[in-house]
Amino acid sequence: MKLSELTLDREGLAAAIACGDAAFETALREEAYRVKVATVGAEVYLRGLIEISNICAKNCLYCGIRRDIRCQRYELSEEEALATARIAAKRRFGSVVIQGGERTDAAFIRKITRLLKAIKAIDTGEDPPLGVTLSLGEQSREVYEEWFDAGAHRYLLRIESSNPDLYRKIHPADHSYDRRLQALYDLKDIGYQAGTGAMIGMPFQTAEDMADDLLFYKKFDAPMVGMGPYNPHPETPLTLSGAPYPSAERRFALGLKMIALLRLLMPDINIAAATALEVLDPLGREKGLLSGANVIMPNITPEEQMVKYNLYDRKTLNATDVQDLESRGAVIGYGRWGDSKHFRK
């Protein structure tokens, strides 16, 4: 397949995803990088990642912190989380992401509300204050409104698969595709920059499924997307089922390809170079940036807790060295929220 033959409809996207030709993949990534620079610029925006808790009420079949898995649970105190946010401010990251297992208990909800207000009050020495993205799963509309009013302005809720049948294969029966979709539309309606994403190269997934994921992002009009390669956790039901999935090399290539295709499909959105890329390649996130991504999320969670937030069998625990990226030519957007151009239209 040649780049000149690429079309951005379902058939063309699926053909590009299925194509394993190295020359095509290289040309695609180079074109996506060119489009990125021309539309959103060369700047890389930083989101300091705070993994606030690995306690989760959900039981997703692929996840290493699912409710029924045996692991050492933790929850950062408000003081620990706030201290970590101050580290982000000191490093001029511009924004933080508060990510954790899904919980809907009142104590946790109130804690996040208090934490948001405290983070927004941090004196960064710059204007604006720290931006805050939340990634805390499905909540009621009322909770989303409470957190928005407390200072969160971006929310990442991954659909994981836009195919309802595939969604049901990787989630227990008490998980609802329709409920997740409604949560996304609630977030958008409230005023969040509502981001989503899916796993890439998981069991049962076809090239057409991945093409549909890309088209789902466009139909939803997502201002930001965080997607990454499927990385199996050895103790999850999906891994233990023995269902086949692509090799690590192929999943990595697919991850870069999906970033590149999405950049061509939605030129002015924010696209994250996911941590999952770096699990498969030491330079994974850098290669993601060169494929069209423009956001990275250095992990600033205290290390003694970071090791417990084991979504998958990850080989890397350290945050991306931002200075190292700079030394190799990346332009870092220090002190900036880096909101999606698409959202600001």
Segments (PLM) and residue ranges:
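Conserved, mostly hydrophobic/aromatic
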Residues: 32, 60, 98, 157, ...
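Canonical Radical SAM [4Fe-4S] cluster-binding loop centered on the CxxxCxxC motif
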Residues: 40-80
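Glycine-rich, proline-tolerant flexible connector loops at the mouths of alpha/beta enzymes
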Residues: 47-50, 96-109, 165-167, 231-242, ...
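Core AdoMet radical
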Residues: 67-82, 88-110, 115-184, 193-200, ...
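Conserved strand-turn element in the central/C-terminal portion of the radical SAM core barrel
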Residues: 103-106, 130-135, 183-209, 227-235, ...
